[in-house]
């Protein structure tokens, strides 16, 4: 009963302050870090059998490091460096950029894939985390052949 009397005596300014603090706390909880941030860059169009360079820049907002494996997948088989797979230690303060050079003579859809994996000997002292929710990230682009 005494608590209710105190509540009704509280000034509107105090009640507004408590409400704002509650809303601010909820908003701060929604501010989550991104596991993987990727930027996949390939030309929109090329001539037949012209060399293509694909670039994938990867970074994280997590405080912990992760072991990542990056590779490309295409809608049609491609030759050359297209089939290279890279494994690296990805940390917040050390983003990575990966490159692939290949040739194609027809239009192709290409997916750049980043898998967070468990592998020893990649990160210093083998200190790396694996996200529980997602461990595969990808983006798809189309390369037109004129």
From Swiss-Prot:
Gene Ontology CC terms: extracellular space
Subunit structure comment from the entry: Monomer. Interacts with AZGP1.
Glycosylated residues in this chain: 105
Protein name according to UniProt: Prolactin-inducible protein homolog
Modified residues (Pyrrolidone carboxylic acid): 29
Protein's UniProt keywords contain Disulfide bond: yes
Principal location listed in the UniProt entry: secreted
SUPFAM superfamilies, per the entry: E set domains
InterPro entries from the UniProt entry: Ig-like_fold, Ig_E-set, PIP
Gene3D superfamilies the UniProt entry points to: Immunoglobulins
Molecular functions (GO terms): aspartic-type endopeptidase activity
Signal peptide (residue range): 1-28
GO terms under biological process: proteolysis; regulation of immune system process
PANTHER family in alphabetical order: PROLACTIN-INDUCIBLE PROTEIN, PROLACTIN-INDUCIBLE PROTEIN/SEMINAL VESICLE ANTIGEN
Compartment list: Secreted
Pfam families linked: SVA
Similarity remark: Belongs to the PIP family.
Keywords, comma-separated and alphabetical: Disulfide bond, Glycoprotein, Pyrrolidone carboxylic acid, Secreted, Signal
Disulfide-bonded cysteines: 65-91, 89-123
């Amino acid at each position: 009963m005494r608590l209710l009397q105190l509540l009704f005596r509280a000034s509107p300014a105090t009640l507004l302050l408590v409400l704002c603090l509650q809303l601010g706390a909820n908003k701060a909880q929604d501010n989550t870090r991104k596991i993987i941030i990727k930027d996949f860059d390939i030309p929109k169009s090329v001539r037949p059998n012209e060399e293509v360079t694909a670039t994938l820049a990867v970074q994280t907002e997590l405080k912990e490091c992760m072991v990542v494996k990056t590779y490309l997948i295409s809608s049609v088989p491609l030759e050359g460096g297209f089939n290279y797979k890279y494994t690296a230690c990805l940390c917040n303060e050390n983003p990575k950029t990966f490159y692939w050079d290949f040739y194609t003579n027809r239009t192709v859809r290409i997916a750049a894939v980043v898998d967070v994996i468990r592998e020893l000997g990649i990160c210093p002292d083998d200190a790396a985390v694996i996200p529980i929710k997602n461990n595969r990230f990808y983006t798809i682009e189309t390369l037109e052949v004129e």
